[in-house]
Amino acid sequence: MRLVDELGLQSVWGADHLLPFAGPDDGACFETLTSLSAMALVTKRARFGVLVNGVVYREPAILAKASAQVDQMSGGRLEFGIGAGWAEREFRAYGLPFPDVAERFARLEEAIEIIVSLWTRPRTTFEGRYYQLHDAPLVPKPVQSPHPPITIGGSGWRTARLAARFASRLNVVGSPAKAAMAFERLQRCCEEAGRAVEEVELSAHPKVAIATSQARAEELALGQAEALGETFPADGSGWIVGSPPQAIAQLQRYAEVGVSHVVLGLGHPFDAELLRLLATEVLPGLS
């Protein structure tokens, strides 16, 4: 985390999982909100967040309160990410109910309404199908006004509609083609919601393997894919792989389809040299 600050990178993001989302399920997997608290204390400049909090893991009022405290601890550097959740094996392992996708999205909509209300109003009363609050205060409020930026994760119509209503950013995992499709959906949903599409940033989350040579980068990518239990796609879809100049060209393709924010997925184990290449040779070359 300190290296992110030292290199001048804009932000660092974690994932919200109860088990490793690939490989053996007994590997290390750190709790998200606890990790954010540590990030708040060991960084001074970089922003940080979760891509994204799974809505069914925690009651929305508890998530709102914990996130507000992290924003306080960091002096207003929290990026708040939230989504419907998808990793069924984690729910089963921990004895949590795993609703169908329609219910998860309905819960997501209610949860965002609750969280924004708790952050911005003195007290909140909410009577929803899934959540109920009764004259609930939340103190202290987040530092950021009116509240921390909200990122909603997903590429379908339901997430686009929610992003158009509530979010500062819509994040999509995958290729430039997938990002382009998500941007078209976001534009239509913003029009329906009476909101300027410029108010909602489109973010992409490709995996990344960058090295001084193409051969070494491909070697890193294959190793990362194997660790994730995946097959590296023949066309490299959803990956940034190559030398710094090649990485710049691949990232520009995202910009061409409306992406203005990229969260690069680093592999395991952590590679400090890759991070330095990003900071010193890739990001300065992006227009």
Predicted regions located by residue number:
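Active-site-adjacent structural elements that line small-molecule/cofactor binding pockets in enzymes
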Residues: 1-287
